[in-house]
Amino acid sequence: MAQFQIECVESNTEESRNHYSKFILEPLERGQGTTVGNALRRVLLSNLEGTAVTAVRIAGVSHEFATVPGVREDVLEIIMRMKEVILKSYSSQAQIGRLLVNGPTTITASHFDLPSEVEVIDPTQYVATIAEGGKLEMEFRIERGKGYRTVERGREEATSLDFLQIDSIFMPVRKVNYSVEEVRADGSIPKDRLLLEVWTNGSISPQEALSSAAGILVDLFNPLKDISLEPTDTNSDIPDDPTAQIPIEELQLSVRAYNCLKRAQVNSVADLLDYTQEDLLEIKNFGQKSAEEVVEALQRRLGITLPQERSSKHS
């Protein structure tokens, strides 16, 4: 069997928080384009490790609905800004970042006092605005992880009651699209060409993301090369897909869209990843408006984008 080739045909890394690359993998046996594309897409979106702010402690603040004197944003807005900050940690241990700023000034990520193991991807990323006489003193916990972690799970691991927990999105890959084309060479048997587009948040390049995803898949399937009939310990812990842990209730959909998905046995974000935007319209009583609502909720809350259409399929 001939080995396929991979080529990066387009790349854009000018924006700090939005890196893009387009890859072509060919030639693949017929049917393998969809198999490889779907597997890579799922792993890229769900299984790569990233960095996120998981908790914030602000001086003089005991809950997220408070305000800080002299700061234009309320605490909830500050927390949302911190959730969006793109960082990269080189440590497997949780790290603590700090901020101490007096007004008047506009606070950006460049004001953070970070450990040497942590890098800020975009120093210009906006956090808050402080007026004359105002002051913002803050500590925040930085962790590495995969997928999405809700506040409830994070609270169990909290090290201090003073910290306000944050729903954390660790996924460094924002979006993945793929399509499959049929190619022929000199009248030979038709083959598949896989076109794969990858967008990341800048903490990892699309090339690094693709390499890591391929490594995960290789490690996953490698034991199948030498199948043993000897009984094995079936009680070993198998890590869950982080995306599978997110119920569709977290998307806060309308009652109509929610009920339609439930009737179609779509109970989690992992189930949704098996659908394209075109597939959603085939769900009974699921109209264009509901499909747009689901797509928008996935993008806004988790940074996930469903493909517009099905990949090309050839009989």
Swiss-Prot record:
Xref: InterPro entries: DNA-dir_RNA_pol_insert, DNA-dir_RNA_pol_RpoA/D/Rpb3, DNA-dir_RpoA, RBP11-like, RNAP_asu_C, RNApol_insert_sf
SMART domains given in the database record: RPOLD (SM00662)
Pfam families linked: RNA_pol_A_bac, RNA_pol_A_CTD, RNA_pol_L
Subunit structure: In cyanobacteria the RNAP catalytic core is composed of 2 alpha, 1 beta, 1 beta', 1 gamma and 1 omega subunit. When a sigma factor is associated with the core the holoenzyme is formed, which can initiate transcription.
Residue ranges, annotated region (Alpha C-terminal domain (alpha-CTD)): 238-315
Gene: rpoA
GO cellular component: cytoplasm; DNA-directed RNA polymerase complex
Protein's name according to its UniProt entry: DNA-directed RNA polymerase subunit alpha
Organism: Trichormus variabilis (strain ATCC 29413 / PCC 7937)
Written domain comment of the UniProt record: The N-terminal domain is essential for RNAP assembly and basal transcription, whereas the C-terminal domain is involved in interaction with transcriptional regulators and with upstream promoter elements.
Family (UniProt): Belongs to the RNA polymerase alpha chain family.
Record-linked CDD domains: RNAP_alpha_NTD
